[in-house]
Amino acid sequence: PEITKIVLANDKEFEIDGADFEDMVRIEGKNLGNVVSVKFNDVEVDPKEIYARYDMLLAPVPRQLPGEVTDMLYITTKNGSVSRPFTVSIPELKIDGLQNEFTNPGDTTVISGDNFDLYGITVEQADVRIGNAICTVIDATRSDITLQIPANAQPNTDLTIQGGEMAEPVAIPYMNTGHQIFDFNDWPGSGGFTHSSQFPDNTLNFLCDGTEGDGYPEPLNEGMKYLRFHGNVGAWGWMVLWAGYIQVPADVAADPAAYNLCFEVCTNASYPLNSTTRIALGNFMWMPGASGIPVNTYGGWRTMRIGLDEVSENTILPDGCSPAPDNTE
């Protein structure tokens, strides 16, 4: 057999020397019929997925991590073998974190990401712990792990994930309070204020603890308060739940790229966060519905994360800014 050209099956014009998992590759040459095996690195293609004739062969790149990376393509037919340098891109494991970092012990939550299946993060193989407390893995897909937080899980402890194809576990935070910049139990706090109440169609106080009645979600933890918007804003009106300045710790200001701004959101399934909702941090604007897809937590608390390197072009003042002027007098 002989290989003269390799292209993607859906783009026969441009020759390639590598591909991604699940790409369909077209191999052109001579004596390519009567195929015995096709391998990318040491991963063999399922024979049922190969189409071959004398001058052409079609084969998908298997979605499987190689045991040995050789950066070679191997073809064996009944008439002999041929190989050619060919690089398959290995996708990295992506772990976004817990959907709710403050899930209470005994409750169920989800870890989101991608390529969990490739790295052996499955119901059978995954070892998920909070400290030494073992989490029960209920379900696992390519992009989600559903698990139960153990009853003896402790706050401010790393959650570790070890898959069957991982050399080392990955750690993500669980109930890590970090550097707290807002305390809704002391709302609006030093340097903060709300000016929404000047509009007659706005609620005067948005601070809740979950005991107000139907429709009010339970707080993340017992005794914790939260802000809730429930109502309508009239034409040319707006609802500012909080505004002011914050004190940023010096170590955060020195290396913003190492930190995320995290907060929890809970939406009614019928009222997701669309493009009319926003959080402003200096010149940075977080608009959850900017992509056209609103954020909907379907009645549960979800952790939102904004990389601080996205805020104010990676520049944060450790002492905050000047307090807003008092124009009420």
Protein language model features and the residues they cover:
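Beta-strand/beta-sandwich contexts
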Residues: 1-34, 79-123, 166-190
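A short beta-turn/strand-edge loop motif at beta-sheet boundaries
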Residues: 31-36, 67, 116-122, 153, ...
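Aromatic sugar-binding surface patches on proteins
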Residues: 50-61, 139-146, 300-313
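Beta-rich carbohydrate-recognition modules and glycan-binding surfaces
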Residues: 173-329
